[in-house]
UniProtKB/Swiss-Prot annotation:
InterPro entries: Globin, Globin-like_sf, Globin/Proto, Hemoglobin_a-typ, Hemoglobin_oxygen_transport, Hemoglobin_pi. The keyword Transport applies. This is Hemoglobin subunit pi. Heme b binds at residues 59, 88. The pi' chain is the counterpart of the alpha chain in the major early embryonic hemoglobin P. Gene3D superfamilies: Globins (1.10.490.10). GO terms for biological process: hydrogen peroxide catabolic process. PROSITE patterns: GLOBIN. Residues 2-142 form the Globin domain. Belongs to the globin family.
Length: 142
């Protein structure tokens, strides 16, 4: 899925705002994921999944760092996330559908934080970008 120059610009522009609150948005996105899709909790049996827990915030930070790497390497998301894709496919064995669910939760969290900036065009660009991220993370399953 190729992003246009305008879509890339929209993703990068919003990311500059998201980056300042990335850890909080990451934790919020995971909280949304676990409350909306409780079956996803099975991948974190060793985590304290209560709201605001250190482990939840830590993993949210890792998730958003990966999104930041994808933004930074928007022309080579595949290369930027290759090791993460292998980790989730071969070692953690996360069901690929969960990446789509998490990306949706990230989209909701970003939209909720920046409603005036999250125009329909920005929404479409971020949706396409996160779909690309999700697609890259599931490539190794094939």
């Amino acid at each position: 899925m190729t992003l246009t120059q305008a879509e890339k610009a929209a993703v990068i522009t919003i990311w500059t705002k998201v980056a300042t609150q990335a850890d909080a948005i990451g934790a919020e996105s995971l909280e949304r994921l676990f409350s909306s899709y409780p079956q996803t909790k099975t991948y974190f049996p060793h985590f304290d999944l209560s709201q605001g827990s250190t482990q939840l915030r830590g993993h949210g930070s890792k998730v958003m760092n990966a999104i930041g790497e994808a933004v930074k390497n928007i022309d080579d998301i595949r290369g930027a996330l290759a090791k993460l894709s292998e980790l989730h496919a071969y070692i953690l064995r996360v069901d690929p559908v969960n990446f789509k669910l998490l990306c949706h939760c990230i989209l909701c969290s970003v939209a909720a934080r920046y409603p005036s900036d999250f125009t329909p065009e920005v929404h479409a660009a971020w949706d396409k970008f996160l779909s690309s991220v999700s697609s890259v993370l599931t490539e190794k399953y094939r």
